[in-house]
Amino acid sequence: PAFQGVGQRLGTEIESSKDEAATAALKTVELDAVLGGRTPEEETFETRLYQFNGANSNLQERALEVLQYLKVMGDPTVTLETTPGKSAEEFLLDENRPKDVALLDDGRVVEEETMETRLYQFNGANSNLGAERSAEEMLLNENRPK
């Protein structure tokens, strides 16, 4: 089995209650059954996601990550800027970016063959209409940021 022993290791490697360790063991058995006993390496792919709430959290939530955002540099001029590793929360709370338009990736795989994920558009309070339209075109034409 691909995940044999993971549940037992979870109980000793991190601080967790007996209930959490038992739930982890049960879920790994279920995951192993879903994968048909194949090793997880066959199913892995590079991801840009990170998790928050700490290692001991029961609710390891996926956080949105800003892949790229369009920054207004003057009236109609728009430049593309990348921000690898910056969370959506950090981006959205930054008060210096009221004119920005962001494309956010939720990281959940929509189509397994292409490993495509869903993208969402965030428009700043004072964002330029041209930047908003450019981002909409990227989403509609599936010209996803790299």
UniProtKB/Swiss-Prot annotation:
Major place of residence: cytoplasm
Function: Ca(2+)-dependent actin filament-severing protein that is required for pollen tube growth. Probably regulates the dynamics of the actin cytoskeleton. It can promote the assembly of monomers into filaments (nucleation) as well as sever filaments already formed.
Keywords assigned by UniProt, alphabetized: Actin capping, Actin-binding, Calcium, Cytoplasm, Cytoskeleton
BP-aspect Gene Ontology terms: actin cytoskeleton organization; actin filament capping; actin filament depolymerization; actin filament polymerization; actin filament severing; pollen tube growth
GO molecular function per UniProt: actin binding
Family recorded in the similarity comment: Belongs to the villin/gelsolin family.
Quaternary assembly: Binds to actin.
Cell location: Cytoplasm, Cytoskeleton
Tissue: Expressed in pollen (at protein level).
One GO CC term, this protein: cytoskeleton
Entry protein name: Villin-like protein ABP41
